[in-house]
């Protein structure tokens, strides 16, 4: 039986997340704390990032709901 090779997940840093979402650092932290944004992962003592696929899925879910502020 062949073993499955796990997919490699890309990690993006804060700058890329902010560019993709147009959100400030404080808004990202608030949404994350409320469970409304993907959780960051610790990369090192002073480095964090997010899985790109989770951020993309979050953006897609906003687009399906009509974007922020549309009561979705």
Can you describe what each PLM-predicted range is?
Residues 1-33, 53-64:
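Polyanion-binding surface elements
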Residues 34-41:
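Short, solvent-exposed alpha-helical "recognition" segments
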Residues 41-47:
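Short Lys/Arg-enriched helix C-cap and helix-to-coil transition segments
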Residues 50:
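Exposed, tryptophan/tyrosine-rich binding patches on extracellular proteins
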Residues 66-72:
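C-terminal secondary-structure termini that scaffold catalytic or DNA-interacting sites
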